[in-house]
Amino acid sequence: MSSILLRSYRHHAKVWTRPSSKSSFIRSLASRSNPTSSFEHVRRVFDDDKYYQDFNNGTLSRKIFSGPRTGLFKNEKLTTPQGLIDFSGQCLTEAQTLVDTMIREAETSDQGKIHYIRRLDQLSDILCRVIDVAEFIRVAHPNSKWTHAAQQTHELMFEYMNQLNTNVQLHTILGNILADKSITSKLSSEEIMVGEYLKQDFERSGIYMEPHTRENFVALTQEISVLGSHFNNGIHELKDYWCEISQQEYEAIDNADLKREIRRFQQKSPRSSRNSVYIPLAGSLPYSILQRCSMESVRRKVWIALHNASEEQISTLNLFLKYRATLSKMLGYESFAHYQLEHKMAKNPENVLTFLENLQRKMVDGENSGLISELESLYAMSNHWKPGASKSDIIHAIQPWDRDYLLHKLQEEKKETQLDDNISEYLSVGTIMSGLSQLFHSIYSIELLPEPSASGETWASQVRKIKVFDNETQSTLGFLYLDFWSPNVLPSHFTIVCSRQLNKDLGEKVEVMKPLVQLDETESHQLPVISLVCNFHQGNSFIGRFAGLETSKPTLLTLDQVDTIFHEMGHAMHSMIGRTKLQNLSGTRCSTDFVELPSVLMESFSKDPRVLGRIARHYSTNELLPHDILAKHQHYRNVLENSETYMQSKMAMLDQVLHGKSIVKQLEMARDDIDSTTMYHSLEKELKVFSDQWSTWHGKFPHLFSYGAVYFSYLFDRAIAEKIWKSLFQNDPWSREAGTTYKEAILKWGGTRDPWHCLADALSNQELSKGDEKAMRIIGGETKDL
């Protein structure tokens, strides 16, 4: 459920060494006077570990060895796990005191009413200050003591937040203020919009319920949060970790390397049988089998086993789907999807399903269908190939366990696309981050500037801190903490602190806030803090430094990993540029089916050869990436691009079905046995392409919890991004004019403006501002843009 107080989107000890040439090194950095040298500095900070250590330790050594240790993200309270728990208790007390103050003042004076929405926003910030960092820690921190403290903290604060969501007194005062024109005439448009948004969330949290019912609502909401945490933690768990095949199937495998690898694991298998062979589902072997094993029955068994979630995971999923349906019914909605989409761009599940169905129909039945062309190419590699096969025959013939095998055969056959050149050598992490700084400098006049981190400020020694700096206003926009080498966390974007203007006139003190957040140059705003975490393989620079090697290889990326960084940096820049006075609607705190637009659009930049061809350089020779190598690799990886889009549309459809009316109807018929597996298999049978009617993969789909009923946003925002790209950046992806238009129309507003109005301005099409069915059809490509 959404909340008036929270819009979540989302090792190594620090070793300080004294560099031998500290002063000269710092002087060399201080002498930077042109963008080229600053971009090179960015590259080396990420690619050269010794350079980074010299930069970090040399600049700060005096402060480090003489000054106090700071806490995570420069919050001085977060120096230990117990510090996090203590901080949560302090914030809880502060929040309770603020609630008493704002109610008392609003009931006794007009000034109290005028300040009420700003106070509510401040209350939200106090709680988010704890909940957001706790959410980050429990997912990304390498130390179990920290993660346990974060889980404890998150549950405590989330429970209090849910109590506030159903506080009748807070809601009544807010409603009276918004209905009083003598008060609203003295409020800014942003304050009114935030007030309306908070009022909506009160009402969507069951504020009109009877007290007992409201208590049940809060308890259910809390239980859903706990179940969601369990669900996310169990995403990688399998029903079984060994796959059984017959001895006969094993003997029929014609790949000697695979047979040898399978045989090697038999002594480690927890089971043994004279007539069976067991394949481990951990490691790379099962994926090698899916790619290279010609025995379809073996691939089938391995694929199903690899996609089977644990039984406990499916039970957890069924339970939170049931509870979500129960809550939506309590609130008077037809389904959880109706509840979720009411105030989104799409407005209702019917519009979402129409969008997805039209997309799928165009992909399957449209002229020159890229999807069918891809399937035909795979079918030509299949043992089931027959001349003159119909489209239906082809779709039916290719099973999900055939996909990787046939793709591997197709790519092996097309040896003209043989990738002799290692494109990754042109795509080091530092090269890409430097390139992003160049791109942002060109289109936004914004740079990424590395900044030293103090002892205790980061959770691991490899974390880089970046200051996002606006050259036009000569001001700091915010800070990024980048951990590209996390061992466990999939690529993720975390909001740690939102931008907000301090309420100095209401008694909020700079000296109190300074130890908790990072302030701007005027000390009037708290700056946004974002963490990006990826699980890239670490280069050998760290090893090389200790082995006495003069040269080292940085982390080298694939094109897909480059897309990932661009995608996540799209979210980050939205947070940096979307700085509002109130934090509730700052940055990425906008409509969920709009929030992916900046990140998806950034993928258009990463895929454009005019961008990578200008920023990608060989890590050792500094040679620019040749266009022919880039073109060859781009073509190679896009072989099943349309198939991937169709698969994503199936996932979005599943998300709608599992949060749709059918589960509510089951509850109305007093049926408690929610069966998500049957619903999944039924939908797969209907949608046909790569149809899975055997596994329980849906239990491994994390977005069913985190993006419940709004997973379609990725495809919807991709459709929007394509239009923005064609309208603004297609002629020149480095255009300052296009960047300014996009920044002014889309990014700077955060969530303080109707997304449809933002699109209407960005695309110069006022028909879109209505946000009606016609606007949806324009975005979906069903009608021509006006």
Curated annotation (Swiss-Prot):
Residues 1-29 form a transit peptide. Binds 1 zinc ion. InterPro entries: M3A_MIP, MetalloPept_cat_dom_sf, Neurolysin/TOP_dom2, Pept_M3A_M3B, Pept_M3A_M3B_dom. It is found in: Mitochondrion matrix. Gene3D superfamilies: Collagenase (Catalytic Domain), Neurolysin, domain 3. PROSITE patterns: ZINC_PROTEASE (PS00142). Its EC number is 3.4.24.59. CDD domains: M3A_MIP. GO terms for biological process: intracellular iron ion homeostasis; peptide metabolic process; protein processing involved in protein targeting to mitochondrion; protein stabilization. Zn(2+) binds at residues 567, 571, 574. GO terms for cellular component: mitochondrial matrix. It comes from the Eukaryota. Keywords: Hydrolase, Metal-binding, Metalloprotease, Mitochondrion, Protease, Transit peptide, Zinc. GO terms for molecular function: metal ion binding; metalloendopeptidase activity. It is an enzyme of class 3 (hydrolase). It catalyses: Release of an N-terminal octapeptide as second stage of processing of some proteins imported into the mitochondrion. Cleaves proteins, imported into the mitochondrion, to their mature size. While most mitochondrial precursor proteins are processed to the mature form in one step by mitochondrial processing peptidase (MPP), the sequential cleavage by MIP of an octapeptide after initial processing by MPP is a required step for a subgroup of nuclear-encoded precursor proteins destined for the matrix or the inner membrane. Belongs to the peptidase M3 family. This is Mitochondrial intermediate peptidase. It comes from Meyerozyma guilliermondii (strain ATCC 6260 / CBS 566 / DSM 6381 / JCM 1539 / NBRC 10279 / NRRL Y-324) (Yeast). The lineage of its organism: Eukaryota, Fungi, Dikarya, Ascomycota, Saccharomycotina. The gene is OCT1.
